[in-house]
Amino acid sequence: MDDIIYDHYIAIDWAKKNMAIARMTKKSNRITVIDVDSDVTELQIYLKNLKGSKVLVLEETTVAQWLYTELKDHVERIIICDPHRNRLLSEGPKTDKIDACKLVQLLRAGLLKEVYHSADEFLYIRRLVSGYEDLIKAGVRLKNQRSALLRSCGKNGNEKGEVELICESDRYVLSCLNRQISAYENEKKGYLKEFRKLSRKHPQIRHQRSLPGIELKNAVKIVARVVSPHRFPDKGHYLSYAGLIKLERISGGRSYGKKEPRYSRQLKSVYKTGVVAAIGGDNPINDYYEYLIREKGYAQHNARNAAARRLAILSLGVFKSGKTFKPSDRRDKKLRKKTKNQACRRCA
């Protein structure tokens, strides 16, 4: 929350059939609340009729992005807040009006945690990535069902194409699964084609692809999830968002261990798989991994985790700089170091 004082503090509890609108002003702690039918046009008129500066808050839901896009031009600021943090809403009786009243109190007190939203061109990329991941999950489920069916009929489970089965019902189910898997593969090719188009259009994706272990799909996922690297104050916040560090719990001068933050599982998967792909290659991530194992005595899993953090930091740096990662600089340094060492040995 910023330090700006607004004339109107507005909270909305939006549902399919109704919306509760609570409002406070900078001069009064009195809350006015109304509960009316859900209508975004009427809501825009309501906001337009309020004179002075306005800040609006609503909770992160499936319609939050749509409301953000529709209302952003009618207020000075919109805050999409994290409902997980709003524990106050769980106390006492619960109605839409009560929820809106509590939400506007949290807004005015500056106690809300904002969820990042934007109305730019990256919205299309985010929706495309979301659809792709849903498709992959559905495809994995279909292939697992096919494998389970074949194994239940005494087969290996890895057979391709049509397989002769004794039971007629099994043959029918197998043919249905084969058709669905074929459709899944075609849809997957369509998504990859769109990803290649996006890579040609957006330099941010090409910059991410220049990193070791980051291929096309993961580069698109990074850009779709991060959108703007400048929303992270430092690398520590980004590593926490990516789930690559744990947060320490200290009270009374005593440590009570560490806990995982609430993080993006998508980003964590991208950097973890990226490190696995980079290890064994001629790149700085593999150099760092080998250094940790040979010089620092790290276990392999700890070295992989540290390398994943290094890859995430490089990814954030590339995003902020707007430039392609250049491993040639590293090779030049290694060559100079090798030449220097050889010269020292000759002198000795």
Feature locations, PLM:
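Phosphate- and other anionic-substrate recognition elements at nucleic-acid/protein interfaces
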Residues: M1-L165, G280, K296, N302
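Non-catalytic, well-ordered alpha-helical scaffold segments
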Residues: Q65, I98-C101, F122, R126-V129, ...
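Amphipathic alpha-helical segments in well-ordered regions
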Residues: E70, L149, V270, G274, ...
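Short helix-capping/linker segments at secondary-structure and domain boundaries
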Residues: G110-K113, L142, S228-R231, A278-P284, ...
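Glycine-rich, often acidic, oxyanion-interacting loops/wings at catalytic, nucleic-acid
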Residues: V129-H207
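Phosphate-backbone recognition surface of nucleic-acid-processing proteins
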Residues: S210, L216, K221-Q300
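Low-complexity, acidic/Ser/Thr- and charged residue-rich accessory regions of DNA metabolism proteins
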Residues: G252-G253, G257, Y289-A348
